[in-house]
Structure formats: structure tokens, C-alpha cells
Amino acid sequence: MLKSISLALALFGLGALPAAAQEYKIAVIGLLHSHVWSHLPEMAKGKTAKLVGIAETVPELVAEARRVAGDGVPIYSDYKKMLDEQKPDIVWSFVENNRHREIVEACAPRKIHVIFEKPLAASYKDALAIRDLANKYGIQVMCNYQMAWWPANFAAKKEVDAGSVGRVWRLRGIVGHGGPGSTGTGKYFFDWLTDPDKNGAGALMDFGCYNALWALWYLGQPESVYAEATHLRPETFPKVEDSSTLMLHWKNAEGVFEGSWDLPRSFQDLEVFGLTGSVYMTQQKVELRKRQASEVAMEPLPPERADPIAFMVDAIRGKKPIDGMTALDINVGVVEIIEAAKESVRTGRAVKLPLPK
């Protein structure tokens, strides 16, 4: 009798744990990217996935991680040892951009899914290699942007897709602030962010990737990229540009995007122009602008799309690809645009897309 009841429960799924109760494990590789400190406290709570390890070798960063995450989370100096001992389902990597490929080379054969902070890679060659590895081993690779979890981004896109401004012909974006901090734990971030090899560029990479992502999300791959870079504060940023402008061209559209470490306050603003109006977006609000401006309602995102770990876990659980702004393909395209922009800065000429692979 008991055997038949157990069989019935199994057949109807009543004896299994609900999907939400299935535990996923996440590990952190590297603490050199300052964004880690805004995510680590939530990871330590284990709401969506259990934090099973952190890998870092810099003593000051290790001490800060221990303070934030607690003594119960093991900290490793060898990230590959951590992967083999803890066997995480997901790795969130906060290393230099030029090490992203290395991390995927370690994680992909172990069937570990990966989250990176933007951009996907420091070079187009590495971005292509990351995609090839992800496809070969069947893992998810997600590229995290702060703005990917803003209701404003989705409200603006929904308004444009509904035809509220007519055919889109122009994008104008500005992203930036007064420059990266260089004190406390931030000094380690500053050191590699201002290194053209480790970052891939300066402000052009740091903020150009946001603008390139917007461009692709709204209009797809441009036909050409022209870029200019400015070195306004060589005493602070001796190796890289601290301000840049991208000019993207499509058959019947254009985009003008600014990214800078020299602004008096923080900006992450986009305006999408159509033939009958525009949509203006910041993190806090979205406006439909015609002769007069009207505020567009912003709906809360569903829980599985409200933060990076929840989104990754939902994709793994549902065996569905990461989509939208954090998807792998669109972020390969982002790095391609930045690569073209760097070539344009070097030559002073527009660069046609697609780039040779």
C-alpha cells in the first residue's frame, strides 16, 4: 500500500521538492572588480543560491570578503581547487576583463555556468572564444549590467516597440561620472581599469559598452562605427582615454553616444528619437516626449528577472537560454563595436561592421 502511494506521488510530482526549493551553489572568482561589494552581501544571504566559496589572493580583499560574507564561506587562493572541491553550479567572476576567457576555459569543461561584469571580454577575439566554449560545453554565460535590472529600461523599450514615437531614426546616450575611485579596496579596481591591456581601453570600454548595448538592443548591428577619444586628465589617467564619443551609423538611423570619467555627476541617460516623438530614460523615470512630456509607467520586474542570480538560476532550472541585455550573443556584438571604435580612434576613420572573425 505504502509503495503504491509513493509511486502515485512520484508520478504526479507530489513527492518531489518544488523547483524553488532545489538548492543551487554559486562561487566567486576574484574580488578586483569593485561591483563585487554591492553583490556579495546579498550572495552571502543565500536567498537564491548558496555561496560556497570565494577565490582571491590579495590579503586586503580577502579580509574584506571575510568581513562581508562571514567565516562560514571558505576562501581559496587557487580558484581551480575551489571549483573542484565545491563544485558550484554558477561562478560569478570579478576579475580583470582580459582574464574572462581564462575563467570560461576553466569553468566550461566543468559544466559551470558563468556570470561576468560587463563587458564580456577585453577583445573581440576573446569574446568569440568565450562564445565558442559556451556552445561547445553547453553552459550559460551571462554578462551583467546594472541597468539590465532597471524597470525603466524595459518600460522605455516597450514604449518604443509599441510605436509611440514612430520609426526610430536616432539614439543619443550618455554614461559616466567623475572617474573611478582609487582608495581603499577601490585602488585595485582603479589599477586594472586604467590599464589598456587588462581593461581593453579606458572610459571607451568602461562606459562605451553600455552605449553599444543600447544601440544593439534598439537597432541591431550598425553598418559602421566612428569614435573619438579624449585625454583630459593625463595626470590621473596616464595610460588610457578618460572620455570618448561613439558615432554609429545604420542604413536609416544614427547613434551618438558619450562615455566619460570627467563628468560633474553620474549619468546613465538614453533618448530614443522616432519620427513622431522621443522616449527619454534614466534609472528613475521614463518620459514620452512630443510637444509635451508625459511620464511612462514603470512596472516591477518579475522576481526571476529582478537580479542576476535569480535570472541565471531561472535559466538553468528551465533549461532556457539567457536572453535580453545580458545574453551572450548581444554582448559579443558589444565587444565587436568597442573593438571597431578602438580601431577608429587609432586610424581616424569609420570602421565597417561586421569585423572579420
What is each residue range found by the language model?
Residues 6-16:
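Bacterial N-terminal signal peptides
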Residues 20-69:
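N-terminal Rossmann-like dinucleotide-binding module
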Residues 28, 77, 116, 141-143, ...:
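Hydrophobic residues in well-ordered beta-strands that form the structural core
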Residues 34, 147-237, 348:
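Predominantly a Rossmann-like dinucleotide-binding segment in NAD(P)-dependent oxidoreductases
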Residues 58-61, 71-133:
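Beta-loop-alpha module in the N-terminal Rossmann-like domain of NAD(P)-dependent dehydrogenases
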Residues 90-92, 314-357:
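C-terminal helix-rich "cap/oligomerization" subdomain common to oxidoreductases
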Residues 129-147, 167-169:
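Rossmann-fold dehydrogenase core element
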Residues 212-285, 309-321, 340, 357:
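Contiguous beta-strand/loop segments that form the cofactor/metal-binding neighborhood of enzyme cores
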